[in-house]
Amino acid sequence: MPDFLSITLSGVPPSLTSGETSNLKWQWVDEGVLMLTPHGACSQSVVLSAGIHGNETAPIEILNQLVSDLLASQLPLAVRLLVILGNPPAIRAGERYLTADINRMFGGRYKNHSLTDEARRAEILEQKVGEFFASDPLSLRLHYDLHTAIRGSHHNRFGLLPYRTTPYCAAMLRWLKDSELDALVMHTSAGGTFAHFSSEFCQAASCTLELGKALPFGQNQLEQFRPITAGLRALVSGGQLPTRSTEAMIFYRVVKSLLKQHADFKLWVADDTVNFTRYPQGTLMIEQLNEHYCVEHEYEWILFPNPRVALGLRAGIMLVQMDENDLLQA
């Protein structure tokens, strides 16, 4: 099979939509969706996705290289694997999205949007992921959705765990640690993200990974992603990662979503504020009609501050630090 990313960017399906190598069988499932299956038995079903936001190119390049190495038999395959490039039109355009953010549409929320290509794409991805996991109901289900952040961060590599009412998968948490993430954030309410969909509707152990900053194709310094790249290669090949050698991962949970509900909304942070900036108790964070929010805990940290979002969307989230053991008792 030719280069996965090149075919996806061309907008033309490959002339051959299935095939096999000495190690695996592959199938072109849909535009930007490729399934790889090892010849032997396996106990894990893994979904790896990137490009849900089209301008977040580093994860796309990482997954494309992973697929190339698997197809060239330079890396063995030990899991059932579905690789997804989420929003091909936006990837071609180099834009975050064309009409609306797909990563707010999952869990059926695409039905609340007009019939755009991106709403249809969210529906297709839900269908393909659901079918993939359902075809092997006894396997361990994992989904990592790879992104890069719009702005800088005190933690360059961090993960976001979707809200769930049962404990998080210990094997997933161990992999996240050994892949040397700097921080992990636990959501405390349901959302429309791809990772939340696979967790809630497919019972997968899921996590959104934020890796560095969004840059155009060819400008990424992929060496800075070496730990997560090594983690992904070990995950799909059945290899073992060395025990974490960097500082311990820091854990956070969401305590407040800053929703922009009125035209007079004001987010009281500087335009150059980076993710995980800390604020002391009493600091005024937002003001709008009939609402203001001040930091309620001794310290809170802000994530994804963006006052320019449309009305009704989240302009940031506030976090507090938490103990790792709470994740296993969620």
From Swiss-Prot:
Its EC number is 3.5.1.96. InterPro entries: AspA/AstE_fam, AstE_AspA_cat, Aste_AspA_hybrid_dom, SuccinylGlu_desuccinylase. Keywords: Arginine metabolism, Hydrolase, Metal-binding, Zinc. GO terms for molecular function: hydrolase activity, acting on ester bonds; succinylglutamate desuccinylase activity; zinc ion binding. CDD domains: M14_ASTE. It catalyses: N-succinyl-L-glutamate + H2O = L-glutamate + succinate. The active site is at 210. It is an enzyme of class 3 (hydrolase). Binds 1 zinc ion per subunit. Gene3D superfamilies: Zn peptidases. Zn(2+) binds at residues 53, 56, 147. Pfam families: AstE_AspA_cat (PF24827), AstE_AspA_hybrid (PF04952). SUPFAM superfamilies: Zn-dependent exopeptidases. Its cofactor is Zn(2+). Pathway: Amino-acid degradation; L-arginine degradation via AST pathway; L-glutamate and succinate from L-arginine: step 5/5. One of its GO terms (biological process) is arginine catabolic process to glutamate. Transforms N(2)-succinylglutamate into succinate and glutamate. Belongs to the AspA/AstE family. Succinylglutamate desuccinylase subfamily. This is Succinylglutamate desuccinylase.
